[in-house]
């Protein structure tokens, strides 16, 4: 995966990319928009000829208690075989309970039981995909800590690291989500990052949030805010360069604004760090 700053590619920006008006270092698309062929898949394959593409899923439901949706995983695998992406990523969440499916990223309680469940689902998904997944931490609006027996609780950062070490997946570290959660739930970003093994972090996401009645919402509809840029600079300075993506999914700006955000991230990468030397993400001896 390119150790550089890319951007999320959404349908309105495809023409600018394909006719050469916009030059991205690499792009990420939402897997579910391209699963079943048609003009959208054709446009994605054309974009793939211009630069690396990463697939980012929102519907695999790795935290679903009744197991992995194998049909959905097979559809993503077929897409990945066609696109040959630089990476395939998903969110650490659930989206189904029995027959009821929710079109959202629902938070998990971080506990031993859920760790076992998610690890099993990731393992099966990776077997179907025949490639490792990157797993992203999500923004949450319900504090699940009260639902967990303190004797079984696992801090979020330790949960992510344990998943990576157990399954061989990587961590997609969303710094905007960490910041949103720190304000909404009173958990410091520093305490979460202290539990995340940087060797397991293969990619970083940056995005903008909105504020409603004192609550921060991960809307992906704004430029990256100053506190998130500060977190990013500090992380890169401490741990080295990582592939970095600017997410912008709502109230889309002109493509040049999106590219300016990516250029700002690239300038930080160029200024603060040499490329990160890949290391194995193993449990400490």
Swiss-Prot record:
Q: Which domain of life is it from?
A: Bacteria
- Does the entry feature the keyword Metal-binding, yes or no? no
- Check the record and name the Gene3D superfamilies matching this protein: Divalent-metal-dependent TIM barrel enzymes
Q: Which Pfam families does this UniProt record tie to the protein? A: MbnB_TglH_ChrH
Query: Which keywords does this chain's UniProt record carry?
Result: Plasmid
Could you tell me which cysteines form disulfide bridges?
A: none
Matching entries from HAMAP family are given as: UPF0276
UniProt family annotation: Belongs to the UPF0276 family.
Name of this chain's protein? UPF0276 protein RSp1035
The organism named in the record is Ralstonia nicotianae (strain ATCC BAA-1114 / GMI1000)
């Amino acid at each position: 995966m390119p150790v550089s700053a890319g951007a999320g590619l959404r349908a309105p920006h495809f023409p600018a990319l394909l006719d050469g008006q916009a030059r991205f270092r690499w792009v990420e698309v939402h897997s579910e928009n391209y699963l079943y062929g048609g003009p959208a898949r054709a446009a994605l394959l054309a974009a793939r000829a211009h630069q690396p593409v990463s697939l980012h899923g929102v519907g695999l439901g790795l935290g679903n208690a009744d197991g992995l949706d194998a049909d959905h995983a097979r559809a993503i695998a077929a897409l990945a075989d066609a696109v040959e992406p630089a990476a395939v990523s998903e969110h650490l969440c659930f989206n189904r309970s029995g027959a009821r499916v929710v079109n959202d990223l629902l938070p998990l309680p971080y506990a031993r039981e859920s760790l076992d469940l998610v690890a099993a689902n990731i393992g099966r998904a990776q077997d179907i995909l025949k490639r490792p997944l990157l797993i992203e931490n999500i923004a949450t609006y319900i504090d699940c800590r009260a639902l967990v027996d303190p004797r079984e609780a696992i801090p979020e950062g330790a949960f992510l690291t344990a998943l990576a070490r157990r399954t061989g997946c990587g961590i997609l570290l969303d710094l905007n989500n960490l910041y949103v959660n720190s304000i909404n739930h009173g958990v410091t970003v520093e305490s979460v990052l202290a539990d995340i093994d940087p060797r397991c972090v293969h990619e970083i996401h940056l995005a903008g949030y909105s504020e409603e009645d004192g609550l921060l919402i991960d809307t992906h509809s704004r430029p990256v805010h100053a506190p998130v840029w500060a977190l990013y600079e500090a992380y890169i300075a401490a741990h080295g360069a990582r592939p970095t993506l600017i997410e912008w999914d709502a109230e889309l700006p002109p493509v040049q604004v999106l590219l300016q955000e990516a250029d700002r991230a690239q300038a930080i990468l160029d200024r603060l760090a040499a490329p990160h030397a890949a290391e194995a993400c193993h449990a400490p001896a």
